[in-house]
């Protein structure tokens, strides 16, 4: 039925628009023309209320493992630079991707320490602690599975605070252990804190290639509590001083961008306060402050937290903290995207090529949906067979729309045809297509993943636009093979140009997604022929040549 064919086109266009609109809404705020230096009233739960200090000047030390290259400031022990050697900045480049950065153009830091009444990071107690370290460079040696970087500070009262970074081979999770030795006569009250701060405006050199047409990924903050497993918090919301202030046992706070994330995970049994803050000068923050801990005189207290700094590898993130893997943002169809990704990853474990894995999963998905596809084509064929009767009825009844509607429904009932029978299978298939889109866009495994020939990065658009053109050709063949009774010249022109419109639209889509649609269209052609043969035997389809 032609109305159902038109519905298919409208649905595809609507879904495409939804994809574009979703990424538009999650896109990071546009740079402002002028930074404001105006002082504002601090919202409850912000950094100032929490006693979280600003960064200071100190000596820089470097820490290198097989997967991390960090720079830590001895003033406060903040991580100010983070390079990821396993992930090049660009395809074919020897320059590693930089996640954390401290430059005049851009700030992105992972801060941590001890605040609270007696904490050395409390601004009321003076400047942030200047830690002593044994050396300026630490390297995880070959055959070494763990690297510890201890930093010590002794206050004026003789109390010793030790902050130790613990790195493990192949791990993007860094434990930060605190030891508080109370040599005084009064209890010390301290609280661990972890804070991520970042410039709202994204300079050109930080562009990860995720801002192409229709491909805007979420960049901002997020947090998790036992009650709210995963909640995003936009940078512009923080910049508007609409700040987060929640208490939670467990959970985490994070900053996200396409493929990569940083997160602080408090490791304690008490209550933590999660907050966001507008720090001014175009910088926003999200962090946590733990419940105060008392260290009695002559005793040593121990506390810990974990910093994730690296790619969004789902299984590794899930092992670090509950729901941390949800930072791989698959949108509202995550419950479909996640199983699809697990299936794709399982296929890749045998095939070894993500492109061929996409081809295989396309066959699997289309195979599962074949009964729906068959039901759709069968319903459309039955509707086509009724067209002569419907046309005769319209001519007989003239402009009497009410009688036309009544007799048409009676005809459907007599012929046992559901006029919406071709729509329901289509509606069911659309979420799967959308889920595949989100999966292919959000999975780090496909970043810089080669396929074959000229396709060296499945997460990027085809540099020569060959795949989008092939996709358009397959759409053209499907259209030519599909029977139609369209007589309106305008509708004919619209249908004729549909493959061209979709080809142009897909020029900027990642090649992995376009590859999926090409294979899906080829499967459609095969399934179409099989279904039509069965319909011919039932007298519901004829091989008449389509009118152009």
Swiss-Prot record:
Membrane topology reported for the UniProt record: Multi-pass membrane protein
Bias kind Low complexity: ranges: 29-42
Subunit structure: Interacts with the Sec translocase complex via SecD. Specifically interacts with transmembrane segments of nascent integral membrane proteins during membrane integration.
Membrane-spanning ranges: 6-26, 350-370, 424-444, 458-478, 499-519
ATP-binding recorded as keyword: no
Name under which the protein is recorded: Membrane protein insertase YidC
Span list, region Disordered: 28-55
GO molecular function, one term: membrane insertase activity
Origin: domain of life: Bacteria
HAMAP family: YidC_type1 (MF_01810)
Protein's organism: Salmonella typhi
Family under the similarity heading: Belongs to the OXA1/ALB3/YidC family. Type 1 subfamily.
Swiss-Prot/TrEMBL keywords: Cell inner membrane, Cell membrane, Chaperone, Membrane, Protein transport, Transmembrane, Transmembrane helix, Transport
Keyword Chaperone in record: yes
Gene of this entry: yidC
Its biological purpose: Required for the insertion and/or proper folding and/or complex formation of integral membrane proteins into the membrane. Involved in integration of membrane proteins that insert both dependently and independently of the Sec translocase complex, as well as at least some lipoproteins. Aids folding of multispanning membrane proteins.
GO cellular component: plasma membrane
UniProt cross-references to CDD domains, sorted A to Z: 5TM_YidC_Alb3, EcYidC-like_peri
Any GO BP: protein transport
